[in-house]
């Protein structure tokens, strides 16, 4: 009979997964929960390839229970019993009528139907770990992509409404959750009464967006917004792939169709849809991650990191940095001047490709 050698838990090598990488990992698995057999296979792969040694294990999935496999809700919860941490990851839109209906609701600033199911999922999590008293010993994080980003933010506030320890929501290419959160609070849609100002709630939200597209400009954002630009080094970018697609369109359809596509700016639209995919955010260490102060105007945060961008030559005006300087300051007058720096996205992408990503601790790349 074949002999098996058992390994003690203490012999398993440990490894840490940074917050954004774990958030991406969780959301990627959450997308599989609409198909139980596909989810179970993916869960085994995730556990074996990523979770062993991390301290995390899968606690629950939306497909585990009939009361959470509703309205297209797709989520996975992870638990680390040693650090007393629970992470809830939510997937975004798939080709499902429930998702499309929720997309319409958030566009008009209503709460998605999935909020009700997210609340039931939180109920299930609390039950699994032994009840509300046990849950209060844990710190909760959430993550999500696209529509799931709004679900992640709402789930975080739901946890907060129950007086649980909510730490942070990490989201990818969010449509913007500010108006939806305000609506849900005003309509008392959360389990507990939420009296915390939205400005305070926003401190628990971290957003990673691709260049502005039709999705991530839907609503106003809350929290720290970061612009994610993959590094390029005079190589083919996503936009050049789009150009290639339109050359193909020209070859099969003729110049008239090609000119219409150019006129309607389908090139930019194609790039935006491509950049919206979850895989765009798979490895932020291979991207420039730049903090944004104003998403609508693409104005960068003015801090020690963005000050370094001043040395980069400019070829466009996609993003701006406003730098104030005191021109006159005496007992009679005080005049403040503003210098405006601007760059094309490609300026930052190409420059960052030549730099080593600077990190704070072992968390996230803040700037190239």
UniProtKB/Swiss-Prot annotation:
Protein's name according to its UniProt entry: Uncharacterized protein RP165
Source organism: Rickettsia prowazekii (strain Madrid E)
